[in-house]
């Protein structure tokens, strides 16, 4: 416990140092008015500090919840178990294992139009059976959210999506089975006025395994890994078309996985992947959501 507390304090000091350094770098000295134009504006400086603090804070939080020691990458056999004929038909003919938990779809080329000039938007849709189905968005830096959920009134609630039959005290991987899995991530759309980015939006939340939701390393590519690519692009001022479609097999309550596509307007970012809704230490009855430990 003491070691964990010291680690948290270390992160706080590091974040404080970053803020002080950024502020010091952005304050012009005794230079003429012609040189101050090259100094970062207050707005730009604040944005950079927010980005740095958000990234550092996220790493601190993730060290105890989604570290490499618990985010065990599912095997290819485990991941392929959800690729039924029906699921494959929805994804298309080009489905390739990436070796790190997910599948590359259509040679990683997204079927999205990013050459648009609309204001940022985000829409969430239910399917014909009332299940969380698709989130579609046009994102830029203004849609980013750097504050935590409690600060914006989007904290945890007792609401649960269908099929959310939690299983805890698991071993050899994440200690719990399920998260409230978002389609459009809070950090990506939480700054967009009018969009419900809470954890109780039935159009944007489905039952998702802890691994599929949280895994974020290059050798364990859950949804959070791909969201991280989009976050970084937005922080660099890119405009990104982004779409997440939950893929269901028949009438199942729990999705087989998330089909995630992204494409920036300038073409610097593009991916088309399927993150299977699996976890190495459980088996799932997707029709009901009942999970069984396989320790």
Locations of regions flagged by a protein language model:
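N-terminal Lys/Arg-rich, disordered targeting/topogenic segments
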Residues: 1-9
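N-terminal, intrinsically disordered, polar/charged segments of Gram-positive cell-envelope systems
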Residues: 31-110
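Sec-dependent N-terminal signal peptides of Gram-positive bacterial secreted proteins and lipoproteins
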Residues: 8-32
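Domain-level detector of nuclease and nuclease-like folds
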Residues: 116, 127-295
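Membrane-embedded alpha-helical bundles that constitute the cytochrome b-like, heme-associated redox core
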Residues: 13, 69-85, 157, 221, ...
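Hydrophobic single-pass membrane-insertion segments
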Residues: 26-36, 260-263
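N-terminal post-signal-peptidase region of extra-cytosolic proteins
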Residues: 108-109, 114-123, 163
